[in-house]
Amino acid sequence: MNSELFSPYTIKDVTLKNRIVMSPMCMYSSENEDGQVTNFHLIHYGTRAAGQVGLVMIEATAVLPEGRISNKDLGIWDDSLIEGLHKTTTFIHDNGAKAAIQLAHAGRKAELETDALAPSAVPFNETMKIPVEMSIQQIKNTILAFQQAAVRSKQAGFDVIEIHGAHGYLINEFLSPLSNKRTDEYGGSPEKRYRFLREIIDSINEVWNGPLFVRISANDYHPDGLTVQDYVQYTKWMKEQGVDLIDCSSGAVVPARIDVYPGYQVQYAKHIKEHANIATGAVGLITTGAQAEQILTNNEADLIFIGRELLRNPYFPRIAANELGFELEEPYQYERAPGKISTNK
């Protein structure tokens, strides 16, 4: 039986064997607080690759030490961090998947002893520290850090880079009027709020020619915040800059009540795909093969990002293939265990 979910997908010179992407999820497992990959990361990501995920995306990886969400985040701010990341990509590749990395800066959501940096001195909520408004020089230094991280990503063997522009972290903070109150060239109009991300994309394009994704929060869930229609314009600009795919999440720039249900963010992937004419990834409570297949068949997205379901079962692709009646090629090490895998939870 043919399946959209298990059809290959090519972006530039990178071909994914299927449309399943492991969504980036922080593991907070750099136990020595130095940003280094640990044995846990090798097992965690390698298992999903062996489970037949098409693209394994490494969690949010900090471009600067002060840009970590926690002191146990992975990092890519120094050349000494390349070796561990390279071991991870090698392990992923050896198990038949492609490897991606999400480059990130936590901004005002950095829960460290050092000052949190943000476009404006506006805290996320009443319990978090008031961030320091970034100077122009700090902005330039951060843009350079993203570029240097892209260089290290190439040296570490990653096939795809994703820029983390969502979930209330630094880039999202610049994009949203709820968190960006600047009156200089990095704040005010949509064009000026976009400038920080524009310059990050330009700087990465100088050193990286592989597939480039951007994760967005397509809805601020606030009457004075951004909506998916605002992101149509942002993503049109991203496409003009050469971004290949928009990973469509939502929320978390301010505290908000979100109506969560299966596939609740697919609407954003569909809207951006249709109105910005750019490839998209759907993410958010996609938990079955049939659900993923329908999203692709309906042309609502191009890739399916799976998060919690892959935490529950690293062999989700095999379960989805069984569900869809698709014969998935097994790793040779597992050939003595053919047949259907139970979908019981």
From Swiss-Prot:
Residues bound to substrate: Y28, H164, G165, A166, H167
This enzyme's EC code(s): 1.6.99.1
Binding site for FMN: S23, P24, M25, C26, A60, Q102, R215, G307, R308
Gene3D superfamilies (UniProt xref): Aldolase class I (3.20.20.70)
Any one biological process term the GO annotation gives: response to toxic substance
GO MF entry, a single one: NADP binding
Superkingdom of the organism of origin: Bacteria
SUPFAM superfamilies, sorted: FMN-linked oxidoreductases
Keywords, alphabetical: Detoxification, Flavoprotein, FMN, NADP, Oxidoreductase
Cited Pfam families: Oxidored_FMN
Reactions it catalyzes: A + NADPH + H(+) = AH2 + NADP(+)
Cofactor dependency: FMN
Function per UniProt: Catalyzes the reduction of the double bond of an array of alpha,beta-unsaturated aldehydes and ketones. It also reduces the nitro group of nitroester and nitroaromatic compounds. It could have a role in detoxification processes.
Protein family according to the UniProt entry: Belongs to the NADH:flavin oxidoreductase/NADH oxidase family. NamA subfamily.
Record text on subunit structure and interactions: Homotetramer.
Protein name, per record: NADPH dehydrogenase
Lineage: Bacteria, Bacillati, Bacillota, Bacilli, Bacillales
